Amino acid sequence: MSEFLTVAFYKFVELQDYAELKAPLLACCQDNDVQGTILLATEGINGAIAGLPHNIHTVLDFLCGDPRFADLAPKESWSEKRPFYRMKVRLKKEIIKMGVPDIDPTQTVGEYVKPEDWNQLLADPDVVVIDVRNDYEVAIGTFKGAINPNTKSFSELPEWLQEQAELQKKPKVAMFCTGGIRCEKSTALLRHEGFEDVFHLQGGILSYLEKVPEDESLWQGDCFVFDERVAVGHGLKPGRYQLCRACRTPISPEDMKSEHYVPGQSCPHCYGTKTEEQQQRFAERQRQIELAKQRNQVHIGAKYSRHQPG
């Protein structure tokens, strides 16, 4: 039975006092044995945390006690193991980094499309569908026919969008991402640039996988998530991927059969790209992880990801 509850949430809202929120929020999470990452900025909050259900609800109650977060809509999923090893509350310039000034999702965004209605939009020949996630995410799963921008980070997307003549040829643009936050900014950017018929998947891929039956789904593959689960599939069940600890790339069961796969040290995606010093460091880290497992302990040095949640 799944024991740990993971919740992902975000909200764009003006937080001039965001720095003052860090200490009490971190203390609340630590007091309730909750792990994960929460980002705070003047533009809002973005987080993913996990713990025992009653502890998670205590933290959410604490958050929603602030009127600015009263309508927070966390997305839930379950796991048998802790998906995070640490609790971090970080202060940022943006809760999801795009790097474009004057883009304010509280003022204008694309039209939300419910997961139940998303298939109909995808079938519209007048719609350009864009996966706004990064290349390593798209590589393990996406919607059929979606355009892959081949970006390494979300901050590369604005430049890519400016170069796309295809967007001028069709009257409608639809975007999707993991949980919705990147679409808030990317659709706001398109609206800012004068596009009128802009849509995005409400609640992101995670809501689609949760609400749309697998036999009706147009999703292909797994959805990368920013924690130790690495990926989830339909019904938000654990996917088939693990994470290469050397390069942070999702690796499939087929990748793990490669002669270039050494647990914690290399995979087919990064074999031969690391220095001898890095290889020695990775080998020692893996040794510590294995020792911790033998002692039935968690090696907190095994970070889940270098990326932001969202």
Swiss-Prot record:
Rhodanese domain boundaries: 123-217
Catalytic residues, chain numbering: 177
Enzyme Commission number(s) from the entry: 1.14.-.-
Family: Belongs to the TrhO family.
Cited PROSITE patterns: RHODANESE_3
Organism per entry: Acaryochloris marina (strain MBIC 11017)
Enzyme kind, highest EC tier: oxidoreductase
Function: Catalyzes oxygen-dependent 5-hydroxyuridine (ho5U) modification at position 34 in tRNAs.
One of the GO BP terms on file: tRNA modification
Reaction catalysis annotation: uridine(34) in tRNA + AH2 + O2 = 5-hydroxyuridine(34) in tRNA + A + H2O
PANTHER family hit by this protein: RHODANESE-LIKE DOMAIN-CONTAINING PROTEIN 7-RELATED (PTHR43268:SF3), THIOSULFATE SULFURTRANSFERASE/RHODANESE-LIKE DOMAIN-CONTAINING PROTEIN 2 (PTHR43268)
Keywords associated with the record: Oxidoreductase, tRNA processing
GO molecular function, one term: oxidoreductase activity, acting on paired donors, with incorporation or reduction of molecular oxygen
This protein's name: tRNA uridine(34) hydroxylase
